[in-house]
Regions:
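PP2C/PPM-type serine/threonine phosphatase catalytic domain
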Residues: 1-328
């Protein structure tokens, strides 16, 4: 017997001056259901375009009968083509999606937005992160070591950065009663452990209450990124009814619009206000250390300023050396 899921989404700009995430949870014309999260990068007038275009293409491709992985491939192609336009260079997006087809579901992802399966027995991450941290941990580094690296915000795959991208797909898996598919951007899970995500979900009333409460908590816990959730709950995941410990609805203060206003004053809206991310490449085992060449990977939202600082320090060092030699 098919279990009809209850759907919910929640997304806020948080402490960022603009929103680059996109979320959806909707039924397709053939009765299948798609839930997805995309986290754009590229700055004002670029990151939001990338995530929105990736989502739009995903839905169109699924409506046309394409498989989930093929829909991601088409999304990558369209975003990459769009990135050739003035002011859009270097834009890209992560994307994670689940398609529920009757009694089964399938998951696909590119980047580090995540899909979890929540149930009475805990939480399991279905998707795999395409990031420096994830790759470093696969090669034996501890999570603490990987997160202390200056490359901790670097992505190894992204929608739209390269002409082609490898898409990871998972499933199909059977839909089980009293479980939930929980998709989120890194703005949420970077301030919460997996256990914390399951705990907070269990304290919230229904999918809508869970989405609102968890976005609110991530914001209050200091997330400095856009925060987004899309979920589908089958039946009802076991919950702790101590509702007084969690807010049911939270509206954060509006983001500071000064960055947008400054960009609008006599400037071309198509010009991004952050540097474009370099292209991604496959790395061998020797690259995952502190000598790793960051110029060969996609840089996620928080990492671009760090890379610019590294380059700037190097240039300053060269200039000072030349001046010293001339004086001598």
């Amino acid at each position: 017997m098919e279990i009809q899921p209850r759907l919910a989404t929640e997304s806020i700009a948080g402490q960022r001056p603009y929103q680059e995430d996109a979320v959806l949870a909707q039924a397709l014309s053939d009765g299948r259901i798609v839930v997805a999260v995309a986290d754009g990068m590229g700055g004002h007038a670029a990151g939001d375009v990338a995530s929105a275009l990736a989502m739009e293409t995903l839905v169109q491709a699924l409506e046309d009968g394409q498989a989930l992985g093929d829909a991601f491939t088409l999304a990558n192609s369209r975003v990459h083509s769009k990135s050739r336009e003035p002011g859009k260079q270097g834009m890209g997006s992560t994307m994670v999606a689940a398609v529920i087809d009757g009694a089964t579901f399938t998951v696909a992802n590119v980047g580090d937005s995540r899909c979890y399966l929540l149930g009475a027995d805990g939480i399991k991450q279905i998707s795999e992160d395409h990031s420096f941290v994830a790759e470093a941990m696969k090669r034996g580094q501890s999570e603490e070591e990987a997160l202390s690296s200056r490359f901790k915000d670097v992505l190894t795959r992204s929608i739209g950065i390269d002409e082609q991208v490898k898409v990871d797909t998972f499933g199909p898996y059977p839909v089980e009663n009293n479980t939930a598919l929980f998709l989120c951007s890194d703005g949420l899970y970077k301030v919460m452990t997996n256990a914390r995500i399951r705990e907070l979900f269990g304290r919230s009333g229904g999918p809508r209450g869970a989405a609102q409460s968890m976005v609110a908590t991530a914001y209050e816990d200091g997330s400095d990124d856009n925060i987004s959730i899309a979920l589908a709950e089958f039946g009802e995941v076991k919950r702790d009814r101590a509702m007084d410990t969690m807010p049911i609805e939270f509206v954060p203060p509006p983001a500071d619009d000064t960055a947008d206003d400054a960009a609008d004053d006599g400037a071309d809206d198509d010009v991004p206000i952050v540097a474009a991310a370099p292209a991604a490449v496959e790395a061998d085992d020797d690259t995952w250390n502190e000598d790793w060449d960051s110029s060969t990977a996609v840089t996620s939202r928080g990492g671009q300023n760090t890379m610019l600082i590294v380059v700037g320090v190097g240039v300053i060092g060269v200039v000072l050396t030349l001046l010293f030699l001339m004086a001598a």
